[in-house]
Amino acid sequence: MFFDLFSSKNKKIVKRWMKEHEEIVTLAHKIIAAYSSNNHILAKKELISLNNTAVNHLMNEDIELYKLLKKRNDMHHKIESDIKKFKENFSETKINLMKFLTYYSKAETPLDESFFDQFNSLVGILGERIDFEENNLYQKLEAI
């Protein structure tokens, strides 16, 4: 805790984002467990929580990465191309995730087999994406 007082802003941001990743993964597992046990009410509740958590995480990530791109010093220049690649590569996945969560978070939208198949596919893609972020982009952010 004392060490956190002296951590760089980027390290604090990365730490927060990694905690949010844990929350997202935990919520995804809760949704799968609830749906698998035929508790669609709980699955919907957890899906709404996931929607809120994911939207907040993505918006904050976009804002902070945008701020980094606006800085024009040597340290930030080193990661500029990595940030641009990250944003370009994740753009389609992010749009699909937001559409999916928005659609299935609606009270009137039932959680059916199509939902479960798509959700499992998205969870796999997001798992890979989170792993990539944490092991590439986030490590570089912490270093500057």
Q: Language model features by range: what are they?
A:
Residues 1-144:
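Small-residue-biased structural context
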